[in-house]
Amino acid sequence: MVSIRPDEISSIIRQQIESYDQSVQVSNVGTVLQVGDGTARIYGLEQVMSQELLEFEDGTIGIALNLEEDNVGAVLMGDGFGIQEGSTVKTTGQIAQIPIGDAMVGRVVDSLGRPIDGKGPISSTATRLLESPAPGIIERKSVCEPMQTGITAIDAMIPIGRGQRELIIGDRKTGKTAIAIDTIINQKSEDVICVYVAIGQKASTVAQIIDTLTEKGAMAYTIVVAANANDPATLQYLAPYTGATLAEHFMYQGKSTLVIYDDLSKQAQAYRQMSLLMRRPPGREAYPGDVFYIHSRLLERAAKLSDALGGGSMTALPVIETQAGDVSAYIPTNVISITDGQIFLSTDLFNAGFRPAINAGISVSRVGSAAQTKAMKKVAGKLKLELAQFAELEAFSQFASDLDAATQAQLARGQRLRQLLKQPENSPLSVWEQVAISYAGLNGYIDTIPVDKVTEFAQGLRDYLKANKAKYVEIINSSKALTDEAETLLKEGIKEFTQGFAA
């Protein structure tokens, strides 16, 4: 027979009483009333925050968007096929956040920071909220450093500075993405962390871009965020904020970053789809009333931080696709008004073989000229004016039969300058190369070269200077200024090469 010891029993009871946890865990649970088309209506979620993450019974995550009197409207971050009417939903107490850190560099992730490149999990413990407030007025400083794109037409006429927002706008198939990718490739020696955000694009297109970046060695400093065309509208809407959050982490560490949103038209369409399904009232072109705000709060996060905060920067290159060149549509005008300038790509120029097909007349950079390198500012100051006057004369000369010698000379130079600015894809130029060809074009050295030989001349001149005028290359690379010595060397080099080329 087992002997029962009262003191032992009382000590066990005492232990149980002492270790009793009085805390009450409240679980906020609701019921799905209706689900479909990537949205759900939920009844019974009494205490839920706007934009809070919700967890459905099958593990799908949603975001609470509409907080109404008797129900909550949520958008889903998955297909939602496992969610049924009457199934339960619980709040998580969290707003959307993603992992951040150095481990993200070189990876391809989705809108929630989950890896989709098949290279295994990302070992990052730090997280950051997707929606962060933009830096205030005191936290910013004026744009003062150049962001070299490697594309002569942009760096000479529409210069971009670190911390600027420069819109790339044009019809489909005019080379918008090519400009963005060239800019990433050109940052190889610049110590800039790049983030490329692909919104609503074909998976094959994104794969091709990743291959190009890998081949050029650019994935070593680039993060790709992809929300493909077959992903839910919620993920396409969140993708740009994910890109901004990843770049922000590095910006506040004092680094320079570059974010490309390709393209924000698709994000606006995804947001329109979500809003209409949530029964929000439509406005112009059926977009909801706050479609301006989704872009302004995204692009305001790009900044050049003050020295007190480390002097880091986030440069944003948003892309917008126009329909038949209509820049006055709703989304294009919205984004033009938020950004610090735009690079307009023309279908006519593209089809005529002038690539990059930049229309210099209506492209502008509002703050970039303050950040342009001294050498480029000195050389290319009148390039934009020359090309604009040439375009005007060219249109006029179609109706005039006899032109005076000065007009003919201006037309001849304009044709050669336009040829000089042609540049193949994925081959950005360094500053000394851009300065050399701009100098040759604007100072009359190519006026006697046949138009069809100008591209060949530019390539040959760059090779000649690299081989024979290393001192010029060294001065430009180190000082970024066209000193008297550098200009003398450049003149000598151009004259020597021109004589040999003509012969």
UniProtKB/Swiss-Prot annotation:
Presence of the UniProt keyword Transport in the record: yes
Annotated family: Belongs to the ATPase alpha/beta chains family.
Gene (UniProt): atpA
Catalytic activity: ATP + H2O + 4 H(+)(in) = ADP + phosphate + 5 H(+)(out)
A molecular function (GO) term: proton-transporting ATP synthase activity, rotational mechanism
Keywords: ATP synthesis, ATP-binding, CF(1), Hydrogen ion transport, Ion transport, Membrane, Nucleotide-binding, Thylakoid, Translocase, Transport
Protein name in the entry: ATP synthase subunit alpha
Complexes and interactors: F-type ATPases have 2 components, CF(1) - the catalytic core - and CF(0) - the membrane proton channel. CF(1) has five subunits: alpha(3), beta(3), gamma(1), delta(1), epsilon(1). CF(0) has four main subunits: a(1), b(1), b'(1) and c(9-12).
Top-level taxonomic group: Bacteria
The organism of origin for this protein: Synechocystis sp. (strain ATCC 27184 / PCC 6803 / Kazusa)
Enzyme Commission number, as recorded: 7.1.2.2
Annotated ATP binding sites: G170, D171, R172, K173, T174, G175, K176, T177
Annotated site residues (Required for activity) in this chain: S363
GO cellular component: plasma membrane; plasma membrane-derived thylakoid membrane; proton-transporting ATP synthase complex
InterPro entries: ATP_synth_asu-like_sf, ATP_synth_asu_C, ATP_synth_asu_C_sf, ATP_synth_F1_a_nt-bd_dom, ATP_synth_F1_asu, ATPase_a/bsu_AS, ATPase_F1/V1/A1_a/bsu_N, ATPase_F1/V1/A1_a/bsu_N_sf
